[in-house]
Amino acid sequence: MMEPHVTELERDIIKEILNIGLARAADSFAVIAKDRVLLKVPDIQLIEVKDLIQLVTKYEDTHVIIQSDIKGDFNGATLMLFSDDHIKMLSEVCLNMVEVQQGVMSVMQESLLLEISNIITGALVTQLANILKSSIYGSPPKAPKNHIAESLKDILVQHPLFQPLVFTVLTQFTHNSKKVELPLLLFFDTNTLLKILDIIRTFSIDKKNMMESD
């Protein structure tokens, strides 16, 4: 498989496309969060599979991880990472819970985290499909009961040449004027990256031809 080469301009374009999608996701999340929500993509990087596994494994002991796979024309996944503090605050705001016990998660709380992941991933995927004219969808989110590395290996085994393009998404959640950040990881495999680059490059060529013909 060819090694993808991404220029700085193309990185910026991909980040901007994702930011447009995340803006819609933030609006959807704000409805249940009952406050302002800001989502943005602060970083984009190509990383090796082993590094991806290490990256998500370090969160396992301190965060509840919700996974949603992206399927169709693109192949990837989103991981939302919730700490005990995040879960406590979201439970109070969205479920009107009082005296939330940290470290113990009820069925209702898990359903809330799944719904938040579903809203954000669903809105993001819909916008990406519209912008990139592609047929993609998000699978129902799940909270892996085994190690997240094992859950991700299911994807990696199916795609042995998987060299993920990883986006770290900063979810900034404002509650009572206090800003809380929820980490979210979004990654695509190499094939998907090549498809996205091809769409961007084709659009750039078409735009250039239109300008020259005017």
Enumerate the predicted regions with their spans.
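Composition-driven recognition of glycine/serine/threonine/acidic- and proline-rich low-complexity segments
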Residues: 2-26, 30-214
